[in-house]
């Protein structure tokens, strides 16, 4: 919210709220840059000008291989939610689809999180022809990861998973002194106060975390909309006693001593971090 004060740097204030206007404009202005930067770096060239698949996602690209030969590559995948990445090649000679074979180096990258193969760039150098398909499989294991200070997180492949806390949305029309009177110039681009509308104070049941499985929802649509997430992970939890909202505004540090509300084990669904707004990502732990 606009009055959050749990950030050690200037104690948060509007820095911790969902709003289009920020005290320092470069923060809001830079926040969205990761996506076009990711897309711009998905496909690179090696020294010969041949294709390098550096970052994965559904895409198509055309490379000029010289001497009138071009190759169109269709990348077919649901990465980062699924393990398989397929590349389908179509070659053209002087603008017409080619039935001939063509020598080409195709380089792909194994991400550092993938333990099934040596990370880094690998090259497949051979004769290719139209219709060839090259498949990269990146096994994604569900991992329980220690957070830097305290608590544990759930990660699968490149994605960290969070509990999407039920949320009350309230428009924030207050004009804050630290913003020097700045307000959004677009009435449809509003400032929001988000507060919990349901239970959030959960601890992972540590000795029940083996054998976690991903649940595929079959949803289509934008995968980072909460209603459309393609994958979920169901985890065992217990409610934590006396872990409450400090000043009714934000989640405090994890409790050093976790006292369960009861012996009852509940199950909650975690979704990709990027599909949440108000979230619990780092959990305290408790025994069954």
Which residues make up each language-model segment?
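C-terminal beta-rich recognition modules with glycine/proline-rich loops and embedded aromatic residues
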Residues: 1-82, 88, 97-98, 137-288
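Surface-exposed coil/turn segments at beta-strand junctions on protein surfaces, enriched
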Residues: 80, 99-101, 127-129
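Beta-strand-rich binding/interaction modules
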Residues: 89, 100-119
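A surface-exposed beta-strand-loop module
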Residues: 116-133, 139-148
């Amino acid at each position: 919210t606009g009055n959050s004060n749990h950030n050690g740097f200037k104690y948060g204030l509007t820095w911790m709220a969902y709003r289009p206007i920020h005290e320092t404009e470069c923060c809001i202005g830079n926040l969205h840059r990761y996506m076009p930067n990711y897309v711009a770096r998905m496909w690179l060239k090696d020294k010969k000008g041949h294709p390098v698949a550096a970052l994965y996602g559904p895409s198509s690209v055309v490379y000029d291989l010289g001497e009138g030969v071009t190759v169109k590559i269709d990348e077919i995948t649901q990465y980062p939610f699924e393990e398989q990445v397929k590349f389908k090649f179509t070659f053209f000679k002087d603008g017409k689809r080619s039935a001939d074979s063509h020598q080409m180096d195709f380089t792909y990258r194994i991400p550092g999180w993938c333990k099934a193969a040596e990370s880094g760039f690998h090259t497949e150098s051979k004769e290719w022809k139209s219709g060839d398909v090259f498949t990269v499989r990146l096994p994604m294991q569900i991992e329980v990861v220690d957070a830097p200070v305290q608590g544990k997180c759930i990660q699968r492949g490149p994605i960290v998973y969070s509990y999407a806390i039920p949320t009350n949305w309230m428009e924030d029309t207050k004009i804050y002194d630290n913003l020097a009177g700045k307000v959004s110039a677009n009435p449809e681009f509003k400032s929001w106060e988000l507060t919990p509308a349901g239970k959030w104070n959960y601890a992972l049941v540590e000795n029940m975390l083996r054998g976690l499985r991903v649940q595929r929802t079959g949803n289509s649509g934008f995968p980072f909309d909460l209603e459309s997430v393609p994958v979920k992970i169901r985890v065992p939890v217990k409610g934590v006693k006396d872990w409450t909202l400090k000043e009714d505004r934000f989640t405090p540090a994890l409790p050093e001593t976790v006292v369960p509300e009861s012996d009852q084990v509940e199950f909650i669904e975690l979704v990709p971090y990027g599909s949440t707004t108000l979230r619990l990502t780092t959990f305290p732990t408790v025994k069954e």
